[in-house]
Amino acid sequence: MELGSLIRATNLWGYTDLMRELGADPLPFLRRFDIPPGIEHQEDAFMSLAGFVRMLEASAAELDCPDFGLRLARWQGLGILGPVAVIARNAATLFGGLEAIGRYLYVHSPALTLTVSSTTARSNVRFGYEVTEPGIPYPLQGYELSMANAARMIRLLGGPQARARVFSFRHAQLGTDAAYREALGCTVRFGRTWCGFEVDHRLAGRPIDHADPETKRIATKYLESQYLPSDATLSERVVGLARRLLPTGQCSAEAIADQLDMHPRTLQRRLAAEGLRCHDLIERERRAQAARYLAQPGLYLSQIAVLLGYSEQSALNRSCRRWFGMTPRQYRAYGGVSGR
């Protein structure tokens, strides 16, 4: 199975809460779509975008909850964007904040785009949103979740009374008028040629309260140092992808090559030119992540095994003996001081 693009696991915030609110057990859904339970609480964790949007559709259909995506946004908003949120929150204006989100949205998922249409001084500013992942059904709930999150972001950046002028969807109406009114707070149009929203030009130019240019500068520098620039070496890119792919359980040379849009043999050949092997880079990153997770006492060993891409905890035990010369429990007991 092709892994496809990834999305930041914070997009799962509130999923288990909403499922339980609707009287359903979230675990069978998470397992069916190969999403590790609890992954949304792990720093910088990513999951399969295709698995996520398919799970949203299945949840909405099987629970007979057509406004599932709109409801899920109640637990989300700007915070799901991580470091991108800090940049947006400290932009000079609402327009600047939304523009920053569009510029850096690839950090959240490379398959999502938010683009600004050209505008005149006295017109609405249009932001077009698109999920570009090929090979998946049209993500109805994914689009509605994203637009409900956009409405929350507009209120956070522009003030409690800030609202878009209009939200636009390509698909037909799914939920009730009241559901859209509560989640989006403005006119909603369906069956259009584009998905996104329009903001009044005066609201777009509104200054963001308490924005700090220095905080924005620091956050931008951090983000650009963590998410590799275009001149990063191939091995650096492989390590970065391994870090994101491990929790999906599909971290392999083939999956990494797919993310890099190259043949696995080409990947191995180019790494060999750096004196490296893909398997070794994956294992090095897995060991580093194991040490980080084992230092967090709130994580069960079974959870750590899943986050490292293992199907069984026994595989984690064997790896820890190989890496550290002791079991995971011993490693924790000794405070992370390995015998090797």
From Swiss-Prot:
Protein name as annotated: HTH-type transcriptional regulator VirS
Taken from the UniProt record, the cysteine pairs bridged by disulfide bonds within this chain are none
What processes in GO biological process is this protein linked to? cellular response to acidic pH; positive regulation of DNA-templated transcription
Q: Which PROSITE patterns match?
A: HTH_ARAC_FAMILY_2
Annotated SMART domains: HTH_ARAC
> A GO molecular-function term, please?
transcription cis-regulatory region binding
Q: Which SUPFAM superfamilies match?
A: Homeodomain-like (SSF46689)
A single Gene Ontology CC annotation of this entry is: cytosol
- So what does this one do? Regulates the expression of the mymA operon (Rv3083-Rv3089).
Taxonomic classification, please?
A: Bacteria, Bacillati, Actinomycetota, Actinomycetes, Mycobacteriales
Q: Which domain of life is it from?
A: Bacteria
Looking at the record, the residues that make up the HTH araC/xylS-type domain are 236-334
Q: What happens when the gene is disrupted?
A: Mutant displays altered colony morphology and cell wall structure, reduced contents and altered composition of mycolic acids along with the accumulation of saturated C24 and C26 fatty acids, and enhanced susceptibility to antibiotics, detergents and acidic pH. Also impairs ability to survive in activated macrophages, but not in resting macrophages.
Q: Which residues form the signal peptide?
A: none
Residue range(s) of DNA binding per entry? 254-275, 301-324
The cross-references to InterPro entries, in alphabetical order and at most eight, read: AraC-type_N, Homeodomain-like_sf, HTH_AraC
Q: What induces it?
A: Induced at acidic pH. Negatively autoregulated.
Maturation and modification: Phosphorylated by PknK. Phosphorylation increases affinity for the mymA promoter.
Instruction: Return the Pfam families for the record.
Output: Arabinose_bd, HTH_18
UniProt keyword annotations, A-Z: DNA-binding, Phosphoprotein, Transcription, Transcription regulation, Virulence
